């Protein structure tokens, strides 16, 4: 029994950039956390409360993103363009709808959900701001997660990783160093999430459609 070097190479080619993308998100969140810390105990606790619900919504998106990687890879291998297109459409639709519904429930009934963790007015204030600014737009993450998953299914894992590094790390660092440095405002700090999602999603979607067009010429 010997190592299949070709298979290992392909696994690393897809897996390493995907891992890098996850690491970049963690680094970006660490930087944002430093900004959150400047708002004291209320800001820190309020953000932590909302994150519990944000993760529920995001993991729905992530589940569909992982699914489209597998099915796109299978059908790309079979050179079935129509199925690849259908996988993208269904994955995006299911991701946006499921995340949108859950996020809406959390936001509409935020008083109840926040109340499960705290009754402190300061914590509630910051938690509801993050609910309204971040969780309301959580379904936007589908734009780069689903299209990025399809790109990985095509064997193009580096493209979404590089675009995500720029959209989710570089942009957020610039925002923290400029806007948040000029204006010490919690709402402006939280606004970087949907802004970066729109930018990253747009870039990865464009990359997906251009790549798909080239692959099935």
Regions found by a protein language model. Give the residues of each.
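C-terminal structured "cap/appendage" subdomains that terminate the fold
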Residues: 147-173, 177-184, 189-191
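Alpha-helical transmembrane segments of multipass membrane proteins
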Residues: 30-34, 56, 104, 146-150, ...
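Small-residue-rich hydrophobic transmembrane alpha-helices
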Residues: 46-110, 141-164
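Short alpha-helical transmembrane segments in multi-pass integral membrane proteins
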Residues: 1-16, 72-137, 179-217
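Juxtamembrane/interfacial segments around transmembrane helices
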Residues: 28-29, 67-68, 143-148, 187, ...
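Helix-terminus/linker motif at the lipid-water interface of multi-pass membrane proteins
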Residues: 23-50, 56, 74, 112-121, ...
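Transmembrane alpha-helical core positions of polytopic small-molecule transporters
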Residues: 25-26, 62, 141-142, 169-172
């Amino acid at each position: 029994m010997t190592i299949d070097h070709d298979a290992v190479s392909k696994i690393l080619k897809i897996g390493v950039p995907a891992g890098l993308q996850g690491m970049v998100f963690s680094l970006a969140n660490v930087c944002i956390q430093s900004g959150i810390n400047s708002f004291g105990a209320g800001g820190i606790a309020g953000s932590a409360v909302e994150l519990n619900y944000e993760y529920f919504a995001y993991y729905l998106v992530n589940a569909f993103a992982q699914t489209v990687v597998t099915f796109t890879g299978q059908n790309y291998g079979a050179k079935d363009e129509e199925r690849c297109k259908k996988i993208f459409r269904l994955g995006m639709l299911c991701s946006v709808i499921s995340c949108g519904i859950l996020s809406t429930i959390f936001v509409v009934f935020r008083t109840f959900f926040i109340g499960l963790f705290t009754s402190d007015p300061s914590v509630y204030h910051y938690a509801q701001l993050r609910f309204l600014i971040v969780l309301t737009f959580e379904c936007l993450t589908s734009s780069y997660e689903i299209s990025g998953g399809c790109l990985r299914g095509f064997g193009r894992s580096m493209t979404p990783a590089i675009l995500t590094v720029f959209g989710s790390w570089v942009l957020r660092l610039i925002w923290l160093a400029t806007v948040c440095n000029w204006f010490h405002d919690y709402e402006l700090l939280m606004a970087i999430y949907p802004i970066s999602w729109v930018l990253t999603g747009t870039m990865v979607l464009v990359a997906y459609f251009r790549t798909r067009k080239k692959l099935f010429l």
